[in-house]
Amino acid sequence: MAVKIRLARSGAKKCAYFKIVIANNCSPRDGAFIEKVGHYNPMLPKDNHERVVLKTDRIEHWLSHGAQPTEKVINFIQQFSITLPLAIQKKHNIKLKNYVAKPSKKK
């Protein structure tokens, strides 16, 4: 069973609120999850400390057991200065370094 750390959307229409959850990668985005490890409210200002809340000890636990975070969750984890496993760090850095904008084709 592959486990992911990802966002699950909740809240009303045009008023999004996301739970940061540990879920099986086959389950739907808003479907069943194993554990809730935080929340993200994009409606709050960026400097508000309640915008992103994480349970750092539980995230470290799941990362040590092989959970794969999504790109957005990796950004949140880095804000909280949680150390990512070396394999995830390499994968994330490779994606950023190999990104090259393709030149437009002129005819």
UniProtKB/Swiss-Prot annotation:
GO terms for molecular function: structural constituent of ribosome. The keyword Ribosomal protein applies. GO terms for biological process: translation. Keywords: Ribonucleoprotein, Ribosomal protein. One of its GO terms (cellular component) is small ribosomal subunit. InterPro entries: Ribosomal_bS16, Ribosomal_bS16_CS, Ribosomal_bS16_dom_sf. Gene3D superfamilies: 3.30.1320.10. Pfam families: Ribosomal_S16. HAMAP family: Ribosomal_bS16. NCBIfam families: S16 (TIGR00002). PANTHER family: 30S RIBOSOMAL PROTEIN S16, SMALL RIBOSOMAL SUBUNIT PROTEIN BS16M. Belongs to the bacterial ribosomal protein bS16 family. This is Small ribosomal subunit protein bS16. It comes from Orientia tsutsugamushi (strain Ikeda) (Rickettsia tsutsugamushi).
